[in-house]
Amino acid sequence: MAIWVDADACPNVIKEILFRAAERTQIPVTLVANQPLRVPPSRFIRTLRVEQGFDVADNEIVRQCAAGDLVITADIPLAAEVLAKGGAALNPRGERYSEATIRERLTMRDFMETLRASGVQTGGPDSLSQRDRQQFAAELEKWLLAVKRQQG
């Protein structure tokens, strides 16, 4: 089991939560990005730098993740591919993607993309709140506990 992070857009506060979890549980965390990242020295935390380009980091995460792995991403198409491979996906706001929710999220994403393409200003997401951080930590902990139970 491993944790993969779509790190280019992942908030630093979420990365910090993941770093602490990696040390505590000794589950490897890999941050995938197209830019250099600073991470604390650890046997359980590494970075993987990919080339610049559309979906290059996403494609690398899909290529390397395995069934049972967790991917941290706000990218809905990436989350859908991870679920199709048997992995789990969690966004930085603490929402765990599922087969039931991913279709709805993809439809909404496509709709918003159509609006933006037609010139409608849709705005971006709100900034990450304390509640979002707590929700993320709680969902991460649920996944970590499930992994621990599986490993005996």
From Swiss-Prot:
InterPro entries: UPF0178 (IPR003791). Transmembrane segments: none annotated. Pfam families: DUF188 (PF02639). Belongs to the UPF0178 family. This is UPF0178 protein KPK_4355. It comes from Klebsiella pneumoniae (strain 342).
